[in-house]
């Protein structure tokens, strides 16, 4: 399995160069047909790309990138966002305390961010405590504001170090680029005004230790170098290669995106500035995995078809389609003419769209022109249908193109919230939504009665309140008694407000009850 994983790169290389996986391969050069026996049939070698005439192999040494160094060098880092949480409290007359929380941003300092990151990585409880809401202070009949600053550390935030100009690239940076980390500049600004990016290593060195020496075989024809067989046995062509310096080392960028440093006698042009080395990400990893699975599957299908042919002593057009070479290069083409099995040498090329080889109805384009058929039969299982259309067995299954469409629809990369192009930031310094998931919830709360006094003060206040209450009750009772006394006297005589005269025992006339009362003790 491991050799197959290493040797599928030619097929993948063409897919990366052209932006999508080739859906088919067809001969652009087709030699004369000759009859063969079924024992001459063989499954093609889909693990080698061959160049015409370069058969002279000689040992040589070259330099290539270490495993894991693909398009750019990964630099791990983190983002630091400053958040201020404000607690506003108001205590009313009866002692109810209302607390309202608000959040806004501030721009953090690199030193503070580095300290917060170290706390988080070390599991220091000070980091979690720094994220808590402030404990609100309060005073009776006053509004009190309490603030607390927090630093939100989001990691990892991986950036790409460009080995060409040593700049950092990520969607979190304004314009996608940061000039780089130096001794004087230890951080990068981000597309959020109150967030900075910093590397995990406080003293990053330019990690250009990315090369390794390897040995292989040079494929040449005379003084011309056509390509080489690398240390893993994979042939790589120098067609379309260009010169490119990587971390100051001059080398060649091949068509499949790989980079090697080797001596050649041919003058090679310089690469355009926009060409990178081995563009590689998580999605291409998935594609590589599917390509390997597909190549293994196709190899097994070819061997099964070949075994069936040998066992049954019969062959069909559909079985011949399994013997087609799946990668560009030299191979064989097979067909059946007049019940005779035929073979021809062929040089295969990649096909990216079906229109390239079927430009019109009934036309199979080979070598720039429509290839003739014999009684409706072409080669490699391709036939002419009853309605005059060219029928290719793989056209119905679309081969690996289905995997590409599946990847486009199902692969969702994990990204930093600031790297999401759909993120819309709020105006001003209002706290963004992406920091809320890292902080406790804030809400308006109302406490019970609390006057903000110590325990002894509370008892004094309660005692004074009780005494005041008693005084008020006593005063009210006294007032009520005084107010009701004249009314009760009048009601005892059923009076209407007139004077009543009475006669005492001595016969003296007393004009009123008050006069009688003032006359001293009277015996009835």
Swiss-Prot record:
It comes from Rabies virus (strain CVS-11) (RABV). Residues 1-19 form the signal peptide. The lineage of its organism: Viruses, Riboviria, Orthornavirae, Negarnaviricota, Haploviricotina. It is a single-pass type I membrane protein. This is Glycoprotein. Belongs to the lyssavirus glycoprotein family. Pfam families: PH_Rhabdo_glycop, Rhabdo_glycop_CD, Rhabdo_glycop_FD. Disulfide bonds join 43-302, 54-226, 80-113, 178-188, 208-247, 242-271, 363-370. A lipid is attached at residue 480 (S-palmitoyl cysteine). It is found in: Virion membrane. Arg-352 is highly involved in rabies virus pathogenicity. Its mutation dramatically attenuates the virus. Homotrimer. Interacts with matrix protein. Interacts with host TRFC. Interacts with host BST2; this interaction inhibits viral budding by tethering new virions to the cell surface. Interacts with ITGB1. Interacts with host GRM2.
